[in-house]
């Protein structure tokens, strides 16, 4: 990345608590460059974060490179995931009996 002398600055942060049956629908993070999530609690059976390959719509006539346009990552407590904010993602229904807890944030170039 060419940051043109700027540095990533965290400009928003929030807590996500997903009880059993909770989910986050597919979304992107507007007005940000870099987004991420730190996992505080990820009990066994907690739902993954699922990223969608945005190139799929542009390759309708091309044969698929793999079976899915989705990439899932199972959260582990104490881990941090970061991605570019334009990347569409979601969290399917939490099937764990305990809460899935994370702290998410957005960064801009300051």
Where are the regions that the model predicts?
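Catalytic core of non-heme Fe(II) oxygenases with the double-stranded beta-helix
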Residues: 9-82, 92
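Surface-exposed helix-capping loop/turn segments at secondary-structure junctions
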Residues: 1-7
């Amino acid at each position: 990345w060419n940051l043109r002398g700027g540095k990533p600055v965290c400009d928003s942060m929030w807590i996500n608590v997903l009880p059993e049956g909770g989910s986050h629908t597919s979304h992107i993070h507007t007005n940000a460059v870099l987004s991420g999530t730190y996992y505080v609690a990820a009990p066994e059976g907690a739902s993954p974060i699922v990223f969608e390959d945005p190139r799929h719509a542009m390759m309708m006539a091309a044969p698929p490179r793999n079976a899915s346009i989705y990439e899932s990552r199972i959260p582990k407590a104490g881990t941090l995931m970061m991605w570019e904010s334009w990347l569409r993602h979601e969290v399917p229904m939490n099937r764990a009996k305990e809460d899935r807890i994370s702290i998410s944030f957005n960064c801009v170039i300051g």
